[in-house]
Regions:
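Conserved N-terminal structural module of periplasmic/extracytoplasmic solute-binding proteins
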Residues: 2-107, 298-300, 417-426
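Conserved C-terminal helix/tail region of periplasmic/extracytoplasmic solute-binding proteins
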Residues: 2-3, 371-426
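Short helix-initiation/N-cap motifs at beta->coil->alpha
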Residues: 73-84, 104, 171-172, 247-261
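A structural signal for short loop-to-beta-strand junctions that line the ligand-binding cleft
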Residues: 86-87, 95-97, 125-158, 301-305, ...
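Hinge/lid segment of periplasmic solute-binding proteins
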Residues: 103-153, 172-174, 292, 361
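Short, solvent-exposed loop/beta-turn-alpha elements that line the ligand-binding surface or hinge
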Residues: 120-130, 190-193, 210-233, 280-284, ...
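Glycine-centered hinge/linker elements that transmit conformational signals in sensory
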Residues: 176-177, 183, 219-249, 294
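Extracytoplasmic/periplasmic substrate-recognition and gating elements
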Residues: 240-243, 280-344
Length: 426
């Protein structure tokens, strides 16, 4: 799940469709003209991040005129991005060269033959000095299909003036929240539960916290069991506790962040970008903003949260695959990965960036991030992941309506049907 990319900064709208259509037209013209005869590398995905224009400019300068990277707009939510990718790649569109892909798409796109395997020197270069978990997100059937650019895990953010000692478990957090509410203080627990990919991340977090999984190791069958029932029980408790936002079932990352920024939340389960975003949105609150590992279900457990992030993949239909690879490597090199981390809050996949003094200063939660990354778990790795994700977000929405045992039973059947490709639109 990338922050504010794979799990969305905003909802899809007709405006986005209009912008996308115009962007596609501009891209088509640029690809044909080549900007005066040169090679154009069309980048889709991640091109609109804060400060990213200077990364593109840097890499274009380094290319020395051999090619020019052109960033193209996509919808800012993961589902909208995937929809555009699928439609254009299925049509063998050669106007897409470099794809900024959510980590959950690797298996699907590789199995469909839409992205190129990286072998030999390219594989060595793409994995050198790269954290292990991000490399795994770019891998399918032991083959590498992407350049890991960013990675991501959620943290617990909290108000230090309200919560001197952060909770370690969900029960502790709910108890603290209730005490704050009773005292007439800000108390809300912020988390994403709208019907979209960010909600699936939280579902996966809770199932994993209970020691369960959603599907088996090869994603061929659901593993919905008593651990899933326990996770759904906790999710229902949260949704009906009176301790979350009244709009929890419509909340994506921006809404969860806004509640924290406005002082309504005492606790917020969100991605690392929160700190850099808060420095811009509400500098006065930054000193009161604390961070801690994601809560566990049982005291003493190690937090195991869902892995997010973005990889650069090269389209099978690109006419310039070598230049596209070079462009991708440049945009995620140590200098530019650090720039994205400082400007946009993008957690780098490159291990070397974590040792840079500038990064350490900007990311006081560095050690928590590394520990969580070490123990992070993926969402179901499957060519039909989108089907599974759709089932999870629809069957369990809204969370307040969950009936743990009955919902688990329905989920089991629906996931099996999704795996078999029944009744789900691609």
């Amino acid at each position: 799940m990338r922050k504010r990319q794979p799990v969305g900064r905003s909802r899809k709208s007709s405006l986005w469709k209009a912008v996308l259509g115009a962007g596609a037209l501009v891209t088509s013209l640029a690809a044909c003209s080549g900007g005066g005869g040169g090679t154009v590398i069309n980048l889709y995905g991640g091109a609109s991040g804060i400060g990213f224009e200077k990364i593109i400019a840097d890499c274009n300068q380094q290319a020395g005129g051999r090619y020019k990277i052109v960033g193209n707009l996509l919808p800012s939510d993961a589902d909208g991005q995937r929809d555009q990718f699928v439609r254009r790649l299925a049509a063998r569109d050669s106007g897409m060269d470099l794809l900024g892909m959510d980590v959950t798409w690797t298996a699907e796109f590789a199995e469909a033959g839409w992205i190129r395997e990286l072998t030999g020197d390219q594989k060595t270069m793409a994995t050198k000095d790269t954290l292990g978990p991000p490399v795994q997100t770019a891998t399918w059937k032991d083959k590498l299909y992407g350049i890991p650019r960013t990675t991501n895990v959620q943290l617990l953010w909290y108000r230090k003036s309200l919560v001197p000692t952060p909770p370690k478990t969900f029960d502790e957090m709910m108890s603290m929240s209730q005490q704050l509410k009773s005292a007439g203080k800000p108390y809300e627990i912020g988390l994403t539960a709208a019907q979209y990919e960010g909600y699936v991340v939280n579902i996966n977090n809770l199932v994993t916290a209970e020691g369960g999984t959603i599907v088996n190791s090869d994603s061929s069958a659901p593993t919905v069991d008593d651990k899933t029932v326990k996770a759904l029980t906790l999710l229902h408790r949260l949704a009906t506790s009176g301790l979350t936002s009244s709009s929890m079932s419509n909340a994506q990352e921006p809404e969860v962040f806004a509640d924290l920024q406005a002082g309504r939340s005492a606790f917020s389960l969100n991605w690392p970008y929160v700190l850099s975003a808060m420095r811009e949105a509400n500098p006065k609150l930054v000193d009161d903003l604390g961070f801690a590992p994601y809560p566990t279900v049982n005291a003493g457990d190690t937090p195991k949260v869902t892995l997010g992030g973005m990889n650069y993949a090269i389209s099978t239909y690109s006419k310039h695959p070598n230049e596209a690879f070079e462009a991708g490597m440049c945009m995620r090199n140590e200098k530019n990965a650090l720039s994205a981390a400082l400007d946009a809050g993008d957690v780098p996949a490159l291990a070397t960036v974590f040792d840079r003094p500038e990064f350490i200063k900007a990311y006081p939660m560095k050690d928590v991030l590394l520990t969580e990354l070490k123990n992070a778990v993926p969402r179901p790795v499957s060519p039909v992941y989108q089907n599974i994700s759709t089932v999870l977000s629809t069957q369990l929405s809204p969370p307040a309506a969950i009936n743990p045992q009955a919902s688990a039973n329905g989920l089991r059947s629906a996931i099996q049907a999704a795996i078999e490709g029944k009744g789900i639109l691609p």
